[in-house]
Amino acid sequence: MLGLIQAAKSLLLLEFMSAFFLAMRQFFSPKPTINYPYEKGVVSQRFRGEHALRRYPNGEERCIACKLCEAICPAQAITIEAGPRRNDGTRRTVRYDIDMVKCIYCGFCQEACPVEAIVEGPNFEFATETREELYYDKEKLLMNGDRWEREIARNILMDAPYR
């Protein structure tokens, strides 16, 4: 009797037909993915993307050259040179470089900064043609901060209750 049932299944291609209908059902179901270059998904406010240096509302850069971000960076991707002290006792950076090739996007630099000068912004589309374009200097970082300031400030404000 068992051989007869097995022969009927083989003759009627029962397993093939069940697999075929399963594939057809999946083929016509809605797709769970998005069409990336044309559609973009929602990015979390805690997303850690391209680095940026922020400015105060009066236009002065926030970084006070404390070098905490350089000290805490596990990948040693940050290099800072502090300028001489100004008349008011503060100091600013002369050189602020981040080697994005070394960076592991851990966010420790952002957490260590006492004035929220260095942040990891919302931009994740910064592919380059050459490796040299991934060595960010102070001007590039300030430009990123100016470009993304509104979104960065909103993300920091929304994340404030959890810090």
Swiss-Prot record:
InterPro entries, alphabetized: 4Fe4S_Fe-S-bd, 4Fe4S_Fe_S_CS, NADH_quinone_OxRdtase_chainI
Binding site for [4Fe-4S] cluster 1: 63, 66, 69, 113
Gene Ontology cellular component list: plasma membrane
Catalysed reaction, written as an equation: a quinone + NADH + 5 H(+)(in) = a quinol + NAD(+) + 4 H(+)(out)
Cited function: NDH-1 shuttles electrons from NADH, via FMN and iron-sulfur (Fe-S) centers, to quinones in the respiratory chain. The immediate electron acceptor for the enzyme in this species is believed to be ubiquinone. Couples the redox reaction to proton translocation (for every two electrons transferred, four hydrogen ions are translocated across the cytoplasmic membrane), and thus conserves the redox energy in a proton gradient.
The protein's assembly and partners: NDH-1 is composed of 14 different subunits. Subunits NuoA, H, J, K, L, M, N constitute the membrane sector of the complex.
The protein's name: NADH-quinone oxidoreductase subunit I
Source species of the chain: Bartonella henselae (strain ATCC 49882 / DSM 28221 / CCUG 30454 / Houston 1)
